[in-house]
Amino acid sequence: MKIAVTKFLGTNCDLDVCHAVKLAGGEPELVFFTQENLDSYKGAVIPGGFSYGDYLRAGAISARTPIIKGLKKMVEEGKPVLGICNGAQIGLEAGFSKGTLTNNLNAKFICKWVYIRVENNKTPFTQYYKKGEVLKIPIAHAEGRFYADDETLDYMYKNNMIVFKYCDETGEVTEEANPNGSIDNIAGVCNENQNCVLLMPHPERASEKILGSDDGLKMFKGMIDYAKRI
């Protein structure tokens, strides 16, 4: 089960993602941003990092490289595509979902463990979680604050495009549990067809208990199992 793991200039979480994909039973393969054709892959993960130094804004340059055409085709064909941190920024810049990611409210880089609540368990990546389940996953970003205008946000709620929200350990969505000022505590979103998920927390860094949590591993297992069925 070949899964493309994208590699841009400045990507630094690719090997961690490859490890998580292997743990989930997949066969990860690093694919550079110059490659446009991804037809031989059953899914893709866009890992985190600081592609192109986050110049202009995070993900803006990467979203204009050749591989985006192949990723868009994957999304349109219903293949599972996961964007993590910088990968989520790239995915939103490329138009894979609605909304945008901008500077954290405190204007600082934030690196810590957080809790997120599953709002939508109908995606390939969340199929093995219960709706309302609380996951312990770390974040590491400076431009992770999700924003969408009222009209866009209403559209996203109506189409079940909100996948994760920041919460406390008990699952309560509070202002104190929001690390970056994201509107409605939103930590992850998806497209209308539910096969592309973009989130700021790093599930690959929570894929083994020795890391402090293995709550993120089910995202990769869900992806692999979904890819086997399509």
Swiss-Prot record:
Name the UniProt record assigns to this protein: Phosphoribosylformylglycinamidine synthase subunit PurQ
Pathway(s) served: Purine metabolism; IMP biosynthesis via de novo pathway; 5-amino-1-(5-phospho-D-ribosyl)imidazole from N(2)-formyl-N(1)-(5-phospho-D-ribosyl)glycinamide: step 1/2
Function field: Part of the phosphoribosylformylglycinamidine synthase complex involved in the purines biosynthetic pathway. Catalyzes the ATP-dependent conversion of formylglycinamide ribonucleotide (FGAR) and glutamine to yield formylglycinamidine ribonucleotide (FGAM) and glutamate. The FGAM synthase complex is composed of three subunits. PurQ produces an ammonia molecule by converting glutamine to glutamate. PurL transfers the ammonia molecule to FGAR to form FGAM in an ATP-dependent manner.
Organism field: Methanocaldococcus jannaschii (strain ATCC 43067 / DSM 2661 / JAL-1 / JCM 10045 / NBRC 100440) (Methanococcus jannaschii)
Annotated catalysed reactions: N(2)-formyl-N(1)-(5-phospho-beta-D-ribosyl)glycinamide + L-glutamine + ATP + H2O = 2-formamido-N(1)-(5-O-phospho-beta-D-ribosyl)acetamidine + L-glutamate + ADP + phosphate + H(+); L-glutamine + H2O = L-glutamate + NH4(+)
Protein's cellular compartments: Cytoplasm
Assembly information from the UniProt record: Part of the FGAM synthase complex composed of 1 PurL, 1 PurQ and 2 PurS subunits.
CDD domains in UniProt: GATase1_FGAR_AT
InterPro entries for the chain: Class_I_gatase-like (IPR029062), PRibForGlyAmidine_synth_PurQ (IPR010075)
Protein keywords: ATP-binding, Cytoplasm, Glutamine amidotransferase, Hydrolase, Ligase, Nucleotide-binding, Purine biosynthesis
EC assignment: 6.3.5.3, 3.5.1.2
Annotated GO MF terms: ATP binding; glutaminase activity; phosphoribosylformylglycinamidine synthase activity
Active-site residues, Swiss-Prot/TrEMBL: 85, 202, 204
